[in-house]
Amino acid sequence: SVPSGAVMIPPMAMPDATFLGFASAIRRLVSVPVITVGRLGDPETAIRAVEDGSADFVALGRPLLADPAWVNKVLRGETVRMCIACNTCVDGMRLGERLQCLVNPVTGRERVFAEAERQGKTLPSGLRIAVVGAGPAGLSYAAAVSKGNTVTIFEKAAVAGGAFRLAGLAPKFQEVEANSMPLLRFIDRL
């Protein structure tokens, strides 16, 4: 049904670790490994779910679309690009469209990027590039062209993040705001 489909892949209005309580209850009743799902993209939440015995494994779907290096980054103690549970990826798939991710512009375009890399295609270097706007798109572009180039980002606001940052002020969009610290760390690496 539509209502159960909407909850099966919990959107940002649902709490982190949406189904962890169910997994924990099941784990106490069975003698086989239990995997839990649903809004476990925060590394601390995922690790705690296994360490406290609520589940034997955590399944990561959308978090790996947001950051394919999620597991390796967590193992190295690095900041991950957090899935904000906006379900852009899910909505597109349900419509038969190309997979997309609001926080990872490469998602759904991996083949294009891999093919360009395989062919040795590189961006021109030695350029002075101006990027207007310090939202996710502008920052992602700036990062993509920064190697060998001088990139200057122009942003009218005092803080980077664009409308993406402001979305966190809306009720039930707190994950967008939670993503602002990784966004600021990303900016620092440019």
Question: Where is each model-derived feature located?
Answer:
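Beta1-alpha1 glycine-rich phosphate/pyrophosphate-binding loop at the start
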Residues: 131-190
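Flavin-dependent oxidoreductase catalytic cores
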Residues: 1-132, 136, 140-151, 159
